[in-house]
């Protein structure tokens, strides 16, 4: 409905602030805003794999559901996932979901919560079969069963039986196939989509989530969505870095909304570098290329991974392979005039195999590297790919905060996918566990809402000032009169993150990074210049809001990394080279006071107990080698 009576005060100018939200106290101009109000049982923010699976599940169950997305659903970044989705189907070889869980716990470097890992790996098989029934066009074996390929960090018989073949694939376009299928199912079940709406903030009341505020990009109108359940499924924040496989839309908007609401994010220091981003462009070359038999080379033409991972070589976990590449480059065995990258060789594979199983890779390599993969290797380099950290949740998707050192559920708020930290990935994600994560926990959220929310539950009125702070922030950005453009500040942030929170880290570099990123954040607040003052398709405004979101997470990532005095998974410190379970086998909870810029770090224990010890025993920590 259109609420013409609601008057929100527009605050144009601002005092300088050390925080990430401006302080509005110097000048104000009163202007009436006509705000469009909506009421739904549930709203889902984001329309990638997790968001669509949650929205589809909710509409299937009869809930009035809205899915709000800043871009068309099939442009969501899930579409770029290539390699596949893990499930112990046992089509290509004997397999067991417990072996999958073992590999996931080991891959997480024992920071993964074993109750959530238990749930995800057990649910993997029915989840993939459900996707098949929905219509995902998986590649097929000769007997008609779903094709499975080898992927990194995966084994049989709890690490004792050799390489597992567990990754279910639709050639090298699995994410594309999955996303289009889920979108079709969501449309079939009459999910209401609000496309090209940018969600700015959560609406909170007494610690509970009541909905969200959004901008309609087409006409600049403000919309308030009231709901009993709000699901955040907005993906990661890879674009905080200079070189990333992520789309430019991957700005972690949901994470930042949660942070602005005074809630924590978890384990943001763990950022995955994929071993095979194309040198120069950062475009992803799937791990499936190595699963099909590809291997890495240094400048001597040596296949070097057997030196670092004797048992599995190029199919070690991603953090191990990325560090190995970096060591080769550091020790002068890099390729090219600058000796700053490695090569991925596929030339020994037949063109028929490549065309059948890796057609997209052949095309991508030609477009972005000028390489015919049947004749020459692809230049590659470790590239930011995935955020293990995010919004802390339990395995049901309910968002967690801490009160007096104890976990507390945030009523009405859920998260799933890369924006969430369940935590099934811990300190390092295994390849092909991401598509599994988004579908399993997108469905889990819908199931939990069904268990806790009665249909036709009446809605309470929203707080009368709901949305005021969000609109004040929008106007503060629109009327910023500093000296630096959004693009200039964004580039500075990305280069700081690329340099100071990289594959290898140490205390001095991280301490410098904390100082630099805090200074960059202050520059965003105090010296931003925008030129478009309108509200209709104002890309200057939206990019600035996205930068604000990225900066929020970049600050917490750097502070969290500087504080963690150990090496674990993707967080590899040269001054603390060993994993320290006695002091650091715990999750980081990071808070940011957006008004003052103050960062607070707390910690919560890793869940080491499985859901059912008789079904799956706890996997105790051991030294992680491949």
Curated annotation (Swiss-Prot):
Disulfide bonds: none annotated. It is found in: Mitochondrion inner membrane. GO terms for cellular component: mitochondrial inner membrane; mitochondrion; phagocytic vesicle; respiratory chain complex II (succinate dehydrogenase). Substrate binds at residues 274, 286, 385, 429. Its EC number is 1.3.5.1. It is a peripheral membrane protein. The active site is at 318 (proton acceptor). Keywords: Electron transport, FAD, Flavoprotein, Membrane, Mitochondrion, Mitochondrion inner membrane, Oxidoreductase, Transit peptide, Transport, Tricarboxylic acid cycle. Its cofactor is FAD. Residues 1-24 form a transit peptide. It catalyses: a quinone + succinate = fumarate + a quinol. Pathway: Carbohydrate metabolism; tricarboxylic acid cycle; fumarate from succinate (eukaryal route): step 1/1. The keyword Metal-binding does not apply. The modification Tele-8alpha-FAD histidine is found at residue 77. FAD binds at residues 46-51, 69-84, 253, 418, 434-435. InterPro entries: FAD-dep_OxRdtase_2_FAD-bd, FAD/NAD-bd_sf, FRD_SDH_FAD_BS, Fum_R/Succ_DH_flav-like_C_sf, Fum_Rdtase/Succ_DH_flav-like_C, SdhA/FrdA/AprA, Succ_DH/fumarate_Rdtase_cat_sf, Succ_DH_flav_su_fwd. It holds the Pfam family Succ_DH_flav_C. GO terms for molecular function: electron transfer activity; flavin adenine dinucleotide binding; succinate dehydrogenase (quinone) activity. GO terms for biological process: defense response to Gram-negative bacterium; mitochondrial electron transport, succinate to ubiquinone; mitochondrion organization; phagocytosis; positive phototaxis; tricarboxylic acid cycle. Component of complex II composed of four subunits: a flavoprotein (FP), an iron-sulfur protein (IP), and a cytochrome b composed of a large and a small subunit. Belongs to the FAD-dependent oxidoreductase 2 family. FRD/SDH subfamily. Flavoprotein (FP) subunit of succinate dehydrogenase (SDH) that is involved in complex II of the mitochondrial electron transport chain and is responsible for transferring electrons from succinate to ubiquinone (coenzyme Q). This is Succinate dehydrogenase [ubiquinone] flavoprotein subunit, mitochondrial. It comes from Dictyostelium discoideum (Social amoeba).
């Amino acid at each position: 409905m259109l609420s013409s009576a609601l008057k929100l005060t527009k605050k144009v100018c601002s005092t300088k602030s050390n925080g990430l939200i401006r302080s509005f106290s110097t000048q104000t101009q009163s202007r009436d805003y006509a705000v469009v109000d909506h009421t739904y049982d549930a709203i889902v923010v984001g329309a990638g794999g997790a968001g669509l699976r949650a929205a589809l599940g909710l509409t299937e169950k009869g809930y009035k559901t809205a899915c709000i997305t800043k871009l068309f659903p099939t442009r969501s970044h899930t579409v770029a996932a290539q390699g596949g989705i893990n499930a112990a189907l046992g089509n290509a070889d004997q397999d067991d979901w417990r072996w999958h869980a073992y590999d996931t716990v080991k891959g997480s470097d024992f920071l993964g919560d074993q109750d959530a890992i238990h749930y995800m790996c057990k649910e993997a098989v029915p989840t993939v079969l459900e996707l098949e029934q929905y219509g995902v066009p998986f590649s097929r074996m000769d007997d008609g069963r779903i094709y499975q390929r080898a992927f990194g960090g995966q084994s049989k018989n709890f690490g004792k039986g050799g390489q597992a073949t567990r990754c279910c694939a639709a050639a090298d376009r699995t994410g594309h196939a999955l996303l289009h299928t889920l979108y079709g199912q969501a449309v079939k079940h009459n999910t209401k989509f609000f496309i090209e709406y940018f969600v700015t903030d959560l609406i909170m009341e007494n610690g509970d989530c009541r909905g969200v505020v959004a901008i309609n990009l087409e006409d600049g109108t403000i919309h308030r969505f009231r709901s009993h359940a709000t699901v955040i499924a907005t993906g990661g924040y890879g674009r905080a870095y200079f070189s990333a496989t992520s789309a430019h839309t991957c700005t972690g908007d949901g994470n930042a909304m949660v942070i602005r609401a005074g809630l924590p994010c978890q384990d943001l220091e763990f950022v995955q570098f994929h071993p095979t981003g194309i040198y120069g462009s950062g475009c992803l070359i799937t791990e499936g290329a190595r699963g099909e038999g590809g291997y890495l080379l240094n400048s001597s033409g040596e296949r070097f991974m057997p030196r670092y991972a004797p048992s599995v070589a190029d199919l070690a976990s991603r953090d191990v392979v990325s560090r190995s590449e970096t060591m080769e480059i550091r020790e002068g065995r890099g390729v090219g005039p600058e000796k700053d990258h490695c090569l991925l060789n596929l030339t020994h594979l037949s063109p028929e195999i490549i065309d059948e199983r890796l057609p997209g890779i052949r095309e991508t390599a030609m477009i972005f590297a000028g390489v015919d993969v049947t004749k020459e290797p692809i230049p590659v380099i470790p590239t930011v790919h995935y955020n293990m950290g995010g919004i802390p949740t339990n395995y049901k998707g309910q968002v967690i905060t801490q009160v007096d050192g104890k976990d507390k559920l945030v009523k009405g708020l859920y998260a799933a996918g890369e924006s969430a930290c369940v935590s099934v990935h811990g300190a390092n994600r295994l390849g092909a566990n991401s598509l599994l994560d988004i579908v399993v926990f997108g469905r889990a959220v819908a199931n939990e809402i069904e268990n806790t929310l009665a249909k036709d539950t009446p809605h309470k009125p929203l707080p009368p000032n709901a949305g005021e702070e969000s609109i004040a922030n929008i106007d503060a950005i629109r009327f910023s009169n500093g000296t630096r453009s959004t693009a200039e500040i964004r580039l500075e942030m990305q280069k700081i993150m690329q340099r100071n929170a990289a594959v290898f880290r140490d205390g001095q570099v991280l301490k410098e990074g904390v100082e630099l990123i805090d200074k960059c954040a202050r520059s965003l607040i105090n010296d931003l210049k925008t030129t478009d003052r309108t509200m209709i398709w104002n890309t200057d405004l939206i990019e600035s809001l996205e930068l604000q979101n990225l900066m929020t997470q970049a600050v917490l990532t750097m502070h969290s990394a500087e504080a963690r005095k150990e090496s674990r998974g993707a967080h590899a410190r040269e001054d603390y080279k060993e994993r320290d379970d006695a002091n650091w086998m715990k999750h980081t909870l990071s808070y940011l006071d957006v008004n003052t810029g103050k960062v607070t770090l707390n910690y919560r224990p890793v869940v080491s107990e499985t859901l059912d010890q008789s079904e799956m025993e706890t996997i105790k920590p051991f030294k992680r080698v491949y």
